[in-house]
Amino acid sequence: MGNTVQTDNDFMQMQKPFALFAKWLEEATVSEINDPNAMALATVDKTGFPNVRMVLLKDFSPQGFVFYTNYESPKGQEILKSMKASLVFHWKSLRRQVRIRGIVEKVTPQEADAYFQSRPRDSRIGAWASKQSQPLESRFVLEKAIARYTTRYAVGNIPRPPYWSGFRVKPLSIEFWCDRPFRLHDRLLFTRDSVEHVDWKRQKLYP
């Protein structure tokens, strides 16, 4: 695959998880075929069953990992109930993985508005037209809704739907995994007791 696997003296010596994540994401941006910011988002429904789906990371900082969605969708409702989530990034081209567990908060309306207005116009129309994850009688019904909202918002800015916004996952743990021969992989775990803490505990793990 042409990938370069980091050695123990490289990422296993890193002290700051967000700096390491930024480095890995930057390298994945070069090597991944598409969507290096794709991540698996895991939530739990009211019966205790887990659900997982792919979403796109839109921003990250020491404050957390941000993505946007329809709050009325199953993932939105599950997050709003528990305010907890897990994320996984898997970069096959680099043979690396990052696992994140944390507490979730809503982004501010100002953040959501700014990101929504940065999206392509057709995507903004789609946010109004799609009743995400609800039963759809036919594609034609969706296309009619798209046409209706295209006409409604033919001129000027398209406002953000009240049910469409973002979440920020504030991590309590971040684990970095790197493939090594014979499944003797490198694993580095950062943990903290509270999302308010800026200091992280750092621990190497057996494969």
Swiss-Prot record:
Binding site residues for FMN: 53-58, 68-69, 75, 97, 132-133, 177, 187
Bound cofactor: record note: Binds 1 FMN per subunit.
Reactions accelerated catalytically: pyridoxamine 5'-phosphate + O2 + H2O = pyridoxal 5'-phosphate + H2O2 + NH4(+); pyridoxine 5'-phosphate + O2 = pyridoxal 5'-phosphate + H2O2
EC number from the UniProt entry: 1.4.3.5
Pathway note: Cofactor metabolism; pyridoxal 5'-phosphate salvage; pyridoxal 5'-phosphate from pyridoxamine 5'-phosphate: step 1/1; Cofactor metabolism; pyridoxal 5'-phosphate salvage; pyridoxal 5'-phosphate from pyridoxine 5'-phosphate: step 1/1
GO molecular function, one term: FMN binding
Binding site for substrate: 58, 115, 119, 123, 183-185
The keyword Flavoprotein is assigned to this record: yes
Cofactor names: FMN
Subunit structure: Homodimer.
Family classification: Belongs to the pyridoxamine 5'-phosphate oxidase family.
Descriptive protein name: Pyridoxine/pyridoxamine 5'-phosphate oxidase
Protein source organism: Bartonella henselae (strain ATCC 49882 / DSM 28221 / CCUG 30454 / Houston 1) (Rochalimaea henselae)
Taxonomic lineage from the root: Bacteria, Pseudomonadati, Pseudomonadota, Alphaproteobacteria, Hyphomicrobiales
